[in-house]
Amino acid sequence: STPKPSSAASDVYKRQALYTELGRFMTGPYGHLVTRAIHEKHTYKEYIGVDACAVNLMRPAMYGAYHHITVLGKENEPCDHMYDVVGGLCENNDKFAIDRMLPKIDIGDIVYIHDTGAHGSAMGYNYNGKLRSAEVLLCEDGTHRLIRRAETPRDYFATLDFLPLMKPLFED
């Protein structure tokens, strides 16, 4: 006999699995990259160099992802300067923002890049010898906790086993 439509649909749903990637939904809005303006360049464009780079947040460099940027202490100032906000890698796509209207940024200003929780640190890498940054958790009561320390040069070389390669150099 032919199964009833409701019974057939029920059998199909029982065999189906649903998989989702909830990173951006669940954690995206809760991470932020805090960086400092350390360079400026005035050519045919205005560039602000920060002490973070694509190592810390690859999404804008990789596929042009938009992340809102706030210049701390200047939230109420007019966004009347157009900048490319760039990192220090030797790659032309190491940019957090292109032609972004922001308040005037001075050397030393804190540049706050929003919504980096899902794929900021998780996509990090050590290109150009850059070390991963520390991560700080801001708790609901206003306190903060270091949840991941910054990498050190020792960390960078920790998985490299080059002593066997060097042994012939020291043999007679």
Language-model segment annotations:
Residues S1-A9, Y13:
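Single conserved hydrophobic/aromatic residue that forms the stacking wall/gate
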